[in-house]
Structures are given as C-alpha cells and as structure tokens.
Amino acid sequence: MILTGKEILKRLGSDIKIEPYDEKLLNPNSYNLRLHEDLLVYSEFPLDMKKPNPVRTLKIPEEGLLLEPGNLYLGRTIEFTETHNLVPMLEGRSSIGRLGMFVHITAGFGDVGFKGFWTLEIQVTHPLRVYSGVQICQIFYHTVEGEISEYKSGKYQANQGIQPSLLYKDFEKK
C-alpha cells in the first residue's frame, strides 16, 4: 500500500523525516523533492566498474544550466530524508518527464532505514535548461509486511551529498 499525503504528514518526525519540510510540496500520495544547485559529471572515459571514476562539479547558475543529450548528470535533492518501517521510492514528476528529462536510470528504490540525500541520475532527450530548486521528483512510501531489518550500513547510507558510483567497493570485498 502507498501512503496518502495525510498519512505522510502524520508520520513526519517518526517513521518519516524530510528536512527541510514545506507543506506546499505535499501531494495526495507523495512529496515533491527539489534539485540542489550542484551536479557531478564523470570526467574521464571509459568508466571502469572496478575503480573510482573521477568527477567534476558543475554549479547551476541563477540563469539555469543547459543539459545536453548523451551525458549523465548526477544531481541530488535539496532535502535530506530518513525513513523507518516503510519503503521509500522516488519517481520523476510528469511535468519533468514531459520535457524529456529522466531523473533516475535504475535507482528509484530505497531500503527501509535509508537516510541521506537522494542522488539523481539525470539524462535528457534533447537540450534542456534546468534550474536549482525546481521540484524535480517525488518521494512516496510503501508499507512493508513481515519482520523489518533496517538498512544500517552500505555505500550510500547517511551520505552528505551527490554520490558517484561506489560499485568498485563491491569488488574489494572479494
């Protein structure tokens, strides 16, 4: 089951934390999250799954930043979220999709217990100017059946910013 907006509001401060929170961003069954001003782009190619890949930071200026097709831009939400006893999920807003923007490639799913900023894997189908602070995606929450084991560790838990791929750490464990 997906929580309603009223239930999201009721669980704020207990099962759900959203900081900063603005009631104007609450929807009937989700909450809109906004795009931070920083983006990361990979700076050396080809990328290698077994190694850290260098990135450079782009700042979205007040007049916006033109994103180009064929590039991957890693962004993040302004909001820091923390979720307990629920599964958080992220989806792009339809207004964003109708401009040809994808906000995640495969990482729209969070684990019970995840806390952090959401890293966005942004791609565009044609040149598109983006702006910091735009309501870019929405978070919604599923209830869970069965005994819950919270996500306590991991490569991306309690992150403090945009997270490039840390897949190389999986190879180090072998």
Swiss-Prot record:
It catalyses: dCTP + 2 H2O = dUMP + NH4(+) + diphosphate. InterPro entries: dCTP_deaminase, dUTPase-like_sf, dUTPase_trimeric. Keywords: Hydrolase, Nucleotide metabolism, Nucleotide-binding. GO terms for molecular function: dCTP deaminase (dUMP-forming) activity; dCTP deaminase activity; nucleotide binding. The record marks 108-109 as: Important for bifunctional activity. One of its GO terms (biological process) is nucleobase-containing small molecule interconversion. The active site is at residue 121. Belongs to the dCTP deaminase family. This is dCTP deaminase, dUMP-forming. The keyword Protease does not apply. It is an enzyme of class 3 (hydrolase). It comes from Leptospira biflexa serovar Patoc (strain Patoc 1 / ATCC 23582 / Paris).
